[in-house]
Amino acid sequence: AFTFAMVSVGLAAPAAMSHTPWVVGVSLAFSTFFAVAAMIIAVLKTALALSHMLSKGVEETALPTLWIWVPILTVLAITLMRQDHGISHTLGLASAGTWLTPLLMVVSAQLFVLLLGGFAMRNHRYLAKVWRGDVKGAPVFALICPGVALSVSLQFLINKGFVAAGLLISFSMVYWIFSVEPLVVMVVTIIVFMRLSR
């Protein structure tokens, strides 16, 4: 699902950057196809995984994948913003309006996924094992992607959501207070990455 989401965001780039209507149209069509495919695959995989987890529990090696929805949602949100830019600027159609509500929904879903995954990881003491270095290998690096994705989503929420809706003034004191949150998430992610790389 994440692969399809990444293809989708790449195919949405021409919609955001091109001034040629047919290029924007092709970009919209293909990026939408891959975005929908990513969502269908992610929902089906999640349903199957939940069924398995409820009957047999979670294997420790699969724990990092519990947070995969976080980067998928970020990438799909970027896809939609790129598409919206092409629709409103190049095709001259009215924009769908503010991004505040969709971005709040994305960040809320991401926080919910992080909480659910965090509870499962806590039951296995997985994060403590990772921090001590007891868990090694490539799968553990999947813990980095959600941190990066959440930081990006929070930046979009602040700038394309709160500022664009007039709830925050760019570079005001409150703006900088809000901006500390994604920076903290990124710093923690970098620290975890450095710890895993030892």
Name the predicted role of every residue range:
Residues 48-64, 128, 163-165, 174, ...:
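Extended intrinsically disordered, low-complexity coil regions enriched in Ser, Thr, Gly, Ala
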Residues 52-53, 80-92:
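Hydrophobic transmembrane helix segments
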Residues 1-11, 30-48, 66-83, 101-124, ...:
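Hydrophobic cores of alpha-helical transmembrane segments in multi-pass integral membrane proteins
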Residues 55-58, 118-135:
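Alpha-helical transmembrane segments
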Residues 1, 15-35, 51-61:
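Membrane-interface helix-loop-helix junctions at boundaries between adjacent transmembrane segments
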Residues 17-28, 87-100, 154-177:
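Extracellular/periplasmic helix-loop-helix junctions in multi-pass membrane proteins
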Residues 76-80, 90, 130-135:
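Extended helix-rich, non-globular scaffold segments
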